Structures are given as structure tokens and as C-alpha cells.
């Protein structure tokens, strides 16, 4: 599922609109991830509190959204642009790549909640395809 030039433009435009609330979306998406998929908490066992909405979860959610925004700037070469992040997640953090898809789903839910008018079916499709490509790029070094 490749991204068309229209998809890329839609993603860039939506993420531009979303920038004012990106920290909230990242924090809420990671909070939802650990609530809905509690097995993901195992990656954060070194945190004192990995419960939904806790300070470490919010902080890391914000960090993740920063990475997603970085990926938007590398939308024409996600695999090449995110190679170091792929290596980090594969070799050091050892995150199961299925979790990238789970987090992407949580992000879509949060985006639609925060921007119900702007999150049209066309935006939904484009952002979903982008997050799927992002997940593939992060999983590149697992092969």
C-alpha cells in the first residue's frame, strides 16, 4: 500500500493542522495503548508508573509524536530516513513490530476524537496508509 502524491499532501496538511494538539494526541495514544493492550506495559517496566495518563507515559507519548512528525518530513523515503530508529527498536529496545500497528491504531482513534471535522474519510485513509508505511519502515531491521 504505497502513498500517492495526493496521500502525501493530505498527510502533510493534516499534520500541519494537528501540530497545536500533537502532544495531547501522542500522550493519549500511548495511554490508550497501555490500557487497551496491557501486554505493551512490559516495554516500560523500568518506569515507576506505566499506567495510562502517568507522567512517564505522557512524556513518552509526546516523544513518539515528535518521531512521527519527523517521519512526515521524511515521507518520500521512510525506510532510509528512519533506519536508525528501526535499528534502535530492533536491536536495543527489542520491540515486537506488531506494537507499531497497535500504536498506529490508537493514534488514529485519538486524531479522530480531537479533530472530528478535519478527520474526513480521505484524511483517515491517507494517515492510515502513512502510519502503515511508518510501521513497515520501523520494522525494516527486523528482517
From Swiss-Prot:
Lineage: Eukaryota, Metazoa, Chordata, Craniata, Vertebrata
Subunit structure: Hb 1 is a heterotetramer of two alpha-1 and two beta-1 chains.
Keywords: Acetylation, Heme, Iron, Metal-binding, Oxygen transport, Transport
Domain Globin: 2-143
Pfam families attached to this UniProt entry: Globin (PF00042)
Annotated GO biological process: hydrogen peroxide catabolic process
Gene name for this UniProt entry: hba1
MF terms (GO), sorted A to Z: haptoglobin binding; heme binding; iron ion binding; organic acid binding; oxygen binding; oxygen carrier activity; peroxidase activity
Binding sites annotated in the UniProt record for heme b: 89
Tissues where the protein occurs: Red blood cells.
PANTHER family: HEMOGLOBIN FAMILY MEMBER, HEMOGLOBIN SUBUNIT ZETA
Keyword Nuclease: no
Gene3D superfamilies for the chain: Globins
InterPro entries: Globin, Globin-like_sf, Globin/Proto, Hemoglobin_a-typ, Hemoglobin_oxygen_transport, Hemoglobin_pi
Residues that hold O2 according to the record: 60
PROSITE patterns in the cross-refs: GLOBIN
GO cellular component: blood microparticle; haptoglobin-hemoglobin complex; hemoglobin complex
Function comment: Involved in oxygen transport from gills to the various peripheral tissues.
Protein name: Hemoglobin subunit alpha-1
Residue list for modification N-acetylserine: 2
Highest taxon of the lineage: Eukaryota
